UniProtKB/Swiss-Prot annotation:
Lineage: superkingdom: Bacteria
Protein name per UniProt: Ribosome rescue factor SmrB
Record NCBIfam families: PRK04946.1
PROSITE patterns found in the cross-reference section: SMR
Family statement drawn from the similarity comment of this UniProt entry: Belongs to the SmrB family.
C-alpha cells in the first residue's frame, strides 16, 4: 500500500532540492538508563548487617523537634521545603510500601531500617510507610524515628490515595545514578 502524501509534486520536488547534500543524523549521543533489574534475593549475610546499620539510627530517647500543628511533616535542613509540598500534593508516587500494622516497636524499627536499606539498594526515591491508627504508639514514634535517619530527606502525611493520616510518604536519599562510560 502506497503512503498518501498531502504535498503537491511541486512541493515534494522543492523539498528534495533543498535536502540535497544532507545526510541522515545517527543517534548515538544519548545513553539510556538501563531498566531496573528484577528484585533478586539478597544474601542473608548481607541483609542482617544492612538492617542493623539502618535501624541503628532509631532511638527512643531522642525526641527531634517536629511541628505538632497540622499534618505530620519533616524536611531535612539541607533539602528544599518544596519537596514536602510535592509529597503533600502527591507528585511523588511511592514504589515501595511498608505496613507496620500489628508490629511491636522493635519490629517496626527493624522493618523501617530494612525499608530504607532496600530503597537505597534498589534506587527507590519514594516509599510509603503505613503505621495505622491503632493505639497511636507507632503513629507517634514513626515520624520521630524517621527524622533521626540521615538518609531520610523528607516525609509528609500521605495523600488519601496512599493512606491519609494513617501513612507517611518518605523521600529517601539514594546514590546518584551514573550512566556507563562510552568506549
Amino acid at each position: 500500500m502506497k503512503k498518501k502524501t498531502t504535498l503537491s509534486e511541486e512541493d515534494q520536488a522543492l523539498f528534495r532540492q533543498l535536502m540535497a547534500g544532507t545526510r541522515k543524523i545517527k543517534q548515538d549521543t544519548i545513553v539510556h538508563r538501563p531498566q531496573r533489574k528484577k528484585i533478586s534475593e539478597v544474601p542473608v549475610k548481607r541483609l542482617i548487617p544492612e538492617q542493623a546499620d539502618a535501624s541503628h539510627y532509631f532511638s527512643d530517647e531522642f525526641q527531634p523537634l517536629l511541628n505538632t500543628e497540622g499534618p505530620v511533616k519533616y524536611v531535612r535542613p539541607d533539602v528544599s521545603h518544596f519537596e514536602a509540598k510535592k509529597l503533600r500534593r502527591g507528585d511523588y508516587s511511592p514504589e515501595l510500601f511498608l505496613d507496620l500494622h500489628g508490629l511491636t516497636q522493635l519490629q517496626a524499627k527493624q522493618e523501617l531500617g530494612a525499608l530504607i536499606a532496600a530503597c537505597r539498594r534498589e534506587h527507590v526515591f519514594c516509599a510509603c510507610v503505613m503505621h495505622g491508627h491503632g493505639k497511636h504508639i507507632l503513629k507517634q514514634q514513626t515520624p520521630l524515628w524517621l527524622a533521626q535517619h540521615p538518609h531520610v530527606m523528607a516525609f509528609h502525611q500521605a495523600p488519601k490515595e496512599y493512606g491519609g493520616d494513617a501513612a507517611l510518604l518518605v523521600l529517601i536519599e539514594v546514590e546518584e545514578w551514573l550512566p556507563p562510560e562510552l568506549p
